[in-house]
Amino acid sequence: MKKRVLAVVMCALMAGTAFTGFKDAGDDKELVLFTWEGMFPQDVLDDFEKETGVKVVYSNFDIDETMLEKLSMAKGGDYDIVIADDYILETAIQEGLAEKLDKDSLENIGNINPLYQGQFYDPDDEYTVPYGAGIPLIVYDPEQVDIDIKGYKDLWDPSLEDSIALTANYRVINGITQLSMGESMNEEEVDVIKKTGEKLLELAPNVRLIQDDNTQNALLNGEASVAFLYTSQVTAALAENPDLKVVYPEEGLGFGIMGMFIPSEAPDKDAAYSFMDYIMQPEVAAKCTDYIGYYSTNKAADELVNPDLVVPDDVTKGEIVQNVSQDADAQYQKNWTEFKAACD
């Protein structure tokens, strides 16, 4: 759980999936789904094929910037459905890469929880449908940590040297540093962001690893004793070790929404609408929510999902990382590059 101008992350592109999205004319009917790995239970995809005759071809990316770059290179084509984070949705819409939705083709659109509609990235809900929501949190092993962690600022405690696992979203990690300093996660002043970078460098000695996929494993296998995790990773960690302690940071929460959209030049828009509507069926939405471990954005599915994944009353009061100016984003990226180098 965000930028007017986004740098091309070449190393991420090299690491991304090799699937191009192109289909031979002789192939059976296919829908190309482009999102992170592990976002759908296989039986949901298989059942869609049984119901429609459309095979889902799953193409994954590692970070949102990889998705945007590939979709831009394809000029809004190659992929039929994309699921990505809120901030990148705004950029995709601004760059003309998202199809304006025909709501008449989405019978189940009324199942979406209004809490997640009318957001900054799509204020009139013209292009996107929420798929899940979350708040990244601190999780730690109380048997291995000598302090009582209450907020982001505690991550800087010297006793945590070489013990923290972080997710790899540069804006989010800059953002929690800003919250620890009493600043907004969406600060635009470059001089203030530079101070964020200085503070972030002070965290480097405490960082054991930075990775976006399965970050919780470092906590579970003992490589790290503290982790900053996405909602799904928190859920996975607690399922394996319920003795871990979850921290709702006292400085405030970050909050994010994942959304689905149909690319502007999607090869099969009819199949895309069918898939999007299928995913909004309560029973299907509940299966997806339980599988990915994010908060449900489908109010019709709430009574069917794990109660822990029904949105808490105040979760949407958290701050969402949003797009910032070119100069501000460049400084955030500079902070991140220097921080990662210091962690090596």
Model regions: which residues?
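General small-molecule cofactor/ligand-binding pocket signal
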Residues: 57-59, 208-210, 245-247
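Periplasmic-binding protein-like
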Residues: 194-202, 240-264
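A ligand-binding cleft/hinge motif common to bilobed small-molecule-binding domains
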Residues: 89-91, 226-243
